[in-house]
């Protein structure tokens, strides 16, 4: 009995001995647990001041970003407000002194006051004088040289959207075309009108090309008509020419100038002079022949002039039936523009 009790007691004692470490561990104050080297990484409680510093840094960075965005937006707004004033300064660079009416009109666009516009132009003229210090320079040259002399982050007199590229005022229309913002609605009608002019100019160019092709055809038709009329005129004046040659007592020949006065020259150029006349003989008279173009070979020219001489001889035969011996004329071609009519005697057959 005692043994059992002892065992039980010993067991209890043993039980108490086994849990003593736990009781001792649980009985220790929390400061000891916190001071132990193994417990600190497990708990991981950060100190108070570094956490506050980190939060302050984050807040400062966020505020700096917001402030930077505000500054950038404000700078862009000021540039947009000053852009129409810069454009006016470029346009009137010979005399950059706007009148009161012009200042009022300039103030309406960027929603500025009259005093702000006046101050901006006064400051701009002052900057031009202080930056370009060369004496006896006109305002136009100062504005042109301003961007070359300006240094640092000073405001430049460019009218681009970001005011970063330096424009010397040589091509202000190009800067107007590249800008955006305030001046975009102003230039849209100009661009649309230019596009409409370009679109409208496509058809006139095609018409011009058609007209360029058409005149040779029209000219050739006129030339053919002129040649036909001249042929009729030549055939009509043969009788008068033969009468004049008879009145001159068979003088042999008359000069090319007289021939050109009496016969209208069918052409005034070498290309038109290549058109020649061809007449065909019929039983009752002569009919109008087509013009043979570009007769250049010597054999064709000989044949042509033989036909002309035969036609002249037949004309004289028809007109001089009552005479035994008459005269006729043969045309001798010396060049493309000069021709000579030579009168020769041709025996005629008497009709009974």
Curated annotation (Swiss-Prot):
* Subcellular location as annotated: Nucleus
Which GO MF terms does the UniProt record name?
Answer: DNA-binding transcription factor activity, RNA polymerase II-specific; RNA polymerase II cis-regulatory region sequence-specific DNA binding
Any single Gene Ontology cellular-component annotation? nucleus
Q: Does the keyword Cytoplasm apply?
A: no
Q: Which keywords accompany this UniProt record? A: Developmental protein, DNA-binding, Homeobox, Nucleus
Q: SUPFAM superfamilies this protein is in?
A: Homeodomain-like
Q: Which GO terms describe its biological process?
A: cell development; muscle organ development
Q: According to the UniProt record, where is the region Disordered?
A: 19-53, 157-194, 245-272
Q: Which Gene3D superfamilies match?
A: Homeodomain-like
Q: Which CDD domains match?
A: homeodomain
Tell me where on the tree of life, at the top rank, the source sits.
Eukaryota
Which stretches are labeled DNA-binding? 71-132
- Family, as annotated: Belongs to the TALE/IRO homeobox family.
Q: What does this protein do?
A: May act as a morphogenetic regulator of cell adhesion.
Name listed for the protein in its UniProt record: Homeobox protein Mohawk
Record gene name: MKX
């Amino acid at each position: 009995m005692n043994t059992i009790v002892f065992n039980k007691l010993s067991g209890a004692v043993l039980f108490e001995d086994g849990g003593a470490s736990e009781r001792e561990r649980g009985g220790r104050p929390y400061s000891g647990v916190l001071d132990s080297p193994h417990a600190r990484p497990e708990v991981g409680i950060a100190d108070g001041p570094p956490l506050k510093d980190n939060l302050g840094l984050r807040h400062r960075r966020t505020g700096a970003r917001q402030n930077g965005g505000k500054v950038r937006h404000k700078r862009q707004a000021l540039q947009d407000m000053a852009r129409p004033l810069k454009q006016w300064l470029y346009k009137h660079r010979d005399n950059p002194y706007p009148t009161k009416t012009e200042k009022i009109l300039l103030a309406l666009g960027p929603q500025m006051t009259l005093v702000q516009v006046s101050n901006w132009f006064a400051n701009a003229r002052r900057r031009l004088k202080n930056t370009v210090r060369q004496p006896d320079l006109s305002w136009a040259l100062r504005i042109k040289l301003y961007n070359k002399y300006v240094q640092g982050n000073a405001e430049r007199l460019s009218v681009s959207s970001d005011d970063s590229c330096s424009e010397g005022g040589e091509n202000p229309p190009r800067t107007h075309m590249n800008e955006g913002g305030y001046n975009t609605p102003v230039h849209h009608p100009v661009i649309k009108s230019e596009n409409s002019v370009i679109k409208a100019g496509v058809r006139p160019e095609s018409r011009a090309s058609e007209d360029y092709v058409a005149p040779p055809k029209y000219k050739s038709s006129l030339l053919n008509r002129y040649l036909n009329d001249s042929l009729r005129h030549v055939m009509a004046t043969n009788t008068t020419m033969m009468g004049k040659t008879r009145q001159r007592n068979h003088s042999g020949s008359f000069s090319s100038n007289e021939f050109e006065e009496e016969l209208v020259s069918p052409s005034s150029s070498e290309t038109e002079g290549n058109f020649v006349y061809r007449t065909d003989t019929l039983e009752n008279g002569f009919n109008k022949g087509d013009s043979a173009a570009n007769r250049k070979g010597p054999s064709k020219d000989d044949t042509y002039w033989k036909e002309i001489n035969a036609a002249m001889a037949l004309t004289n035969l028809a007109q001089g039936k009552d005479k035994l011996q008459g005269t006729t004329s043969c045309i001798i071609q010396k060049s493309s523009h000069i021709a000579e009519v030579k009168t020769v005697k041709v025996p005629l057959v008497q009709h009974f």
